Structure formats: C-alpha cells, structure tokens
Amino acid sequence: MNIILLGPPGAGKGTQAKLISEKYSIPHISTGDIFRKNISNKTPLGMEAKSYMDKGQLVPDELTIEIVKDRLGEEDCKNGFLLDGFPRTVKQAEALDEFLQNKSSKTDAALLIDVPQELILERMTGRRVCGECGASYHIKFITPKTEGVCDLCGGKLVQRKDDTKETVLERLEVYSKQTQPLIEYYKNKNVLLALDGTKEKNEVFENISNVLGAIN
C-alpha cells in the first residue's frame, strides 16, 4: 500500500507514521531523513542538495523528486511505502504519480491528520526541554515534579526557538499555503482521507486502520 501522510506541524504525524509502518510492514520514509542520509553518504544527489542548503536556499523540486524516486526504488518499498514530508507541492505530487504509473502502481491513500490551530499552538508552545540532558516535558501534558526543573538531572527547562508562538504561527502559515493545493489535488483524485487528529493517539490510529482497511 502506497500512503502519503499530510498534516500540520504538531499533528502527531511521527507517532502515527511509526504505528502505520509497523502494522502494514512498509517503510516510513521521511524526506528529512533521506536528505540527511544522502548528504552523510556523500551521494551525487546529496552533494547537489547540500550545495543549495549551505546557501540557505530551498532544494529545487526536480532534485527533491530525484532523491525521493531513488529511495522508492529500493527493495523495501516493493510492497508499498509511507511518505512523510513529500510531496509538498502539486508539481511534486504529479511527478510522484507519474513515477508510480510507470511502475504500474499508484497512490492508494493520502491521509490528512487534521488538528485545529489552537490545539497545535497549545501542543507546541507548551513543550519544554532540559537544557542539560535533553529530556522532554510539556507544561500541561508532561509536567515535571518541580516547575521549570528537570526530574532526571535537576537542569533548567527551556523552550526551544522552534516552539515559540511566533515560529509556530510562521510554520503553520507556510504549511497552509503549501498544503491546501495538495489537499485539493488528492481530493480530486478521490484518495484523500481526512482524520480527526484531536483524539488520543490510539484512537487516531484505530480510525486510520479502519479507513485503510476499507480500501486495502
């Protein structure tokens, strides 16, 4: 089964991706991971991508597409895959569909984990990490015994720059601009499956399993 995973930052995609990957025995392919692997292994594609990233530029669609296609050609993808972080644009989605059609395959489902902005802000801006040992906390969901102090090492808990309200709102705006056309694209292909991401993680996964079971 070939699955695309869509959803805003803070929607819990990573958690669900791990569960889906285990249940359906398909690799969870994160574009961030395959970029890092190509750069670490100094592949020609990785070095080309690094040249853009070092200048603070976006990696062009064509190069991103080639890196993803290269990964999808590996043996562990023969029975399907779960793509997370790709496609980000309609152009990338069209290139993926063309690649799959050439292999007599297709996108089976585009899962959209939907979470309202207020809840994402609560989830992400409430995150805290220990400045000493890196342990994770949340001011509402995973609280330390003593406010602002790590249970494990006594270090000071801090908010990462990525988790400030301003940064989260910027990321949500970028996501909205990028993803809305993709949502329409997959809706028109009749493969978009929207799920309520506000539920507890096991309930979200149960709903995902039900909708995937209906098409599998």
UniProtKB/Swiss-Prot annotation:
UniProt enzyme class: transferase
Ranges for region NMP: 30-59
Catalytic activity: AMP + ATP = 2 ADP
Subcellular location: Cytoplasm
Enzyme Commission no: 2.7.4.3
GO molecular function: adenylate kinase activity; ATP binding; zinc ion binding
Protein's UniProt keywords contain Transit peptide: no
PROSITE patterns with a match to the protein in the record: ADENYLATE_KINASE
Subunit structure: Monomer.
UniProt comment concerning the protein's domains: Consists of three domains, a large central CORE domain and two small peripheral domains, NMPbind and LID, which undergo movements during catalysis. The LID domain closes over the site of phosphoryl transfer upon ATP binding. Assembling and dissambling the active center during each catalytic cycle provides an effective means to prevent ATP hydrolysis. Some bacteria have evolved a zinc-coordinating structure that stabilizes the LID domain.
Protein name per the record: Adenylate kinase
Protein's organism: Clostridium tetani (strain Massachusetts / E88)
Organism phylogeny: Bacteria, Bacillati, Bacillota, Clostridia, Eubacteriales
